[in-house]
Amino acid sequence: MAPKDVRALIREGKINGPTAGMSGGYAQANLVVLKKDLAFDFLLFCQRNQKPCPVLDVTEAGSPVPSLAAPDADIRTDFPKYRIYRHGILTEEVSDITPYWEDDFVGFLIGCSFSFEQALINNGIAVRHIDEGTNVSMYKTNIDCVPAGAFHGQMVVSMRPVPERLAVRAAQVTSRFPAVHGGPIHIGNPGAIGIRDLGKPDFGDAVSIRDGEVPVFWACGVTPQAVAMNVKPEMVITHAPGHMLITDIRDESLAVL
């Protein structure tokens, strides 16, 4: 299904779950919305932390239109689910942020690793959360991000189990896509990056890990949500983890090789 058709169904409330596997071949995006007076600090944070926060588009202040990524989209309605954070506390989860929108809001679209999953599949590497019909597993880590202005915190990662013999290939395939997190930041022992139990993700759902597989971890665009909990601004709006915007950007247009 074309991205604009998926967005229309989301806008109508007919799609309200995770978007992994939808509109294969098109990039998906995370969302961060905050007030204009914090926008420069956040843009600087993204520039200093490009693995977890690769910027695909930034809206004009007050505009809900991502003019580069999807010119006919509306970031207030075209994600299946949103999270509202007030002073660092998650207060609401909604399907439409139009009632919350303010004239000085700036929206950031952050590249999402769902965008390189089709490339993994094309290379014979199954994506477990798609096969199991669940959300991707995401975890807080002990990896510090580079601070910028008010923004500081630890990186969040997504995890996909990969057969050990294909782990290097998974790294090669995804390294072609730096605009959507690129290659993995860690392979193997989760404890080395501060993850205690793969069966208890901080965001998303747990997936099965089979004999002969290793966990492979990629930087994740949910990182700004963890950072928002530290910064505690008056209001930050994000997507709900796994519930992305389908953009009009072709995955392959983001590849470097």
From Swiss-Prot:
<comment type="similarity">
    <text>Belongs to the D-glutamate cyclase family.</text>
</comment>
<keyword id="KW-0456">Lyase</keyword>
<dbReference type="InterPro" id="IPR009906">
    <property type="entry name" value="D-Glu_cyclase"/>
</dbReference>
<dbReference type="InterPro" id="IPR038021">
    <property type="entry name" value="Putative_hydro-lyase"/>
</dbReference>
<dbReference type="InterPro" id="IPR016938">
    <property type="entry name" value="UPF0317"/>
</dbReference>
<protein>
    <recommendedName>
        <fullName>Putative hydro-lyase YcsI</fullName>
        <ecNumber>4.2.1.-</ecNumber>
    </recommendedName>
</protein>
<dbReference type="Pfam" id="PF07286">
    <property type="entry name" value="D-Glu_cyclase"/>
</dbReference>
<dbReference type="GO" id="GO:0016829">
    <property type="term" value="F:lyase activity"/>
</dbReference>
